[in-house]
Amino acid sequence: MNKITTLFQNRQRNIVSIYFTAGFPQLNDTIEIIKELQINGIDMIEVGVPFSDPIADGKVIQASSYKAIQNGMNLKILFKQLEAIKSKIQIPLIIMSYLNPIIQYGFENFCEDCHKIDISGIIIPDLPFEEYINEYKFITDAYDLKMIMLISPKTSEERIRLIDSNVEGFIYMVSSAATTGIQESFDEQKQEYFRRINSMKLRNPRLIGFGISNKETLTVALENASGVIIGSKFVSLLAEENNPKKAVQKLLAELK
């Protein structure tokens, strides 16, 4: 069974998923970061593929992408790194990438290689939903990859229900229609959006991302979702500490 499915079926508490950019701060940090996150009880990990034009990302993740590219990170290297730790990772791994690097690699080749190294899901923020359904869903299904779709405050109820009925795994609730980034708190408008989606009683569990950075934002998000995704905050700590173990410990301390 897919590890994402197993995680949500067996969960005893809210899910915490962490995002980081592969190849940042250093090219070979990927393995250590994943190991440290798993050791410290993180439920799921999103590994970002660096891209030169990351339109959905704020300054922190953009900067990490540029640095990772300078370090030499690409999909081929990432797959080699993940292959090396495949047998030691029990939690779900998700690859987050813009469409261009995947097309360059070959979409089916990408999915096949993800399957070989036990990747559970993929997120492609610039892949239109209709294009996914018409051109790519049969491929991801063939390799047991959960396609994680994003929704935002601007996504209509009709579209949310359409997404919910056509995907499995979980739905990624973006806390704002802007780019990723760190927020100290969620205003009433964002909280109303969380409550609105919660009241829709969707089939899929939902994780809230974009802006989770401290105990306050974590608590508010968990009131209206099955878990959270933390990205910019962790990437900024990786940049600050330049030490994966210290960055993980500092993140967990700030969320308590």
Curated annotation (Swiss-Prot):
Its EC number is 4.2.1.20. Tetramer of two alpha and two beta chains. Pathway: Amino-acid biosynthesis; L-tryptophan biosynthesis; L-tryptophan from chorismate: step 5/5. It comes from the Bacteria. InterPro entries: Aldolase_TIM, RibuloseP-bd_barrel, Trp_synthase_alpha_AS, Trp_synthase_suA. SUPFAM superfamilies: Ribulose-phoshate binding barrel. It catalyses: (1S,2R)-1-C-(indol-3-yl)glycerol 3-phosphate + L-serine = D-glyceraldehyde 3-phosphate + L-tryptophan + H2O. Belongs to the TrpA family. The keyword Kinase does not apply. PANTHER family: TRYPTOPHAN SYNTHASE ALPHA CHAIN, CHLOROPLASTIC, TRYPTOPHAN SYNTHASE, ALPHA CHAIN. GO terms for molecular function: tryptophan synthase activity. This is Tryptophan synthase alpha chain. One of its GO terms (cellular component) is cytosol. The keyword Lyase applies. The alpha subunit is responsible for the aldol cleavage of indoleglycerol phosphate to indole and glyceraldehyde 3-phosphate. Keywords: Amino-acid biosynthesis, Aromatic amino acid biosynthesis, Lyase, Tryptophan biosynthesis. HAMAP family: Trp_synth_alpha (MF_00131). The active site is at E46 (proton acceptor), D57 (proton acceptor).
